[in-house]
Regions:
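Flexible mid-to-C-terminal extensions adjoining Fe-S/redox cofactors in radical SAM and related proteins
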Residues: 80-150
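Radical SAM enzyme [4Fe-4S]-AdoMet core and its adjacent flexible, acidic
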Residues: 1-76, 80-86
Length: 150
């Protein structure tokens, strides 16, 4: 797995650093041949792979240009983030009010610049990775940049 959530958190299901690089190399090759339109998701900054494995450079758009209403009515900045990051419920809260006033943690990510991100040389490109890669304490669960460039 690439995204360590749910059953994917099991270390037995995690891909190795070598497999991860192989996956990205495969995506690059497929995009060059144009036989398959392969694209890597918003799983964080990828260094030299940026511009080669997806149609845009990495940004986490959760709360910036993306908001979601989930099946239970929860208002979330992204369907992939943890429920403790939800900012309201459509049955109780005004969506526009939530969008305008409660998504600040997504728009100002300085709170993420801690632990392994505190002194990261690519912070200005990464901004702490995707919100879905944070645990309930805000700690980063996975850094794909580190996975590639240890």
């Amino acid at each position: 797995t690439i995204f360590p959530s749910g059953r994917g958190k099991d270390p037995e299901l995690q891909i190795t650093d070598e497999q991860f690089r192989g996956l990205l190399d495969f995506i690059v090759r497929m995009r060059e041949t144009k036989k398959i339109h392969a694209s890597f998701s918003c799983e964080g900054f990828l260094g030299e792979y940026e511009g080669k494995v997806r149609d845009h450079y990495y940004t986490c758009q959760a709360g910036l240009s993306i908001a979601s209403v989930l099946c239970d009515g929860s208002i979330s900045a992204c369907t992939s983030i943890r429920s403790d990051y939800h900012q309201g419920n459509i049955y109780k809260d005004d969506f526009w009010e939530v969008w305008e006033n409660k998504f600040e943690p997504y728009r100002n990510r300085e709170w993420m610049k801690k632990d392994e991100c505190a002194d990261c040389k690519v912070w200005k490109f990464c901004k702490g990775n995707g919100m879905h890669l944070r645990d309930s304490d805000g700690k980063l669960k996975l850094c794909n940049y580190k996975k590639l460039y240890k």
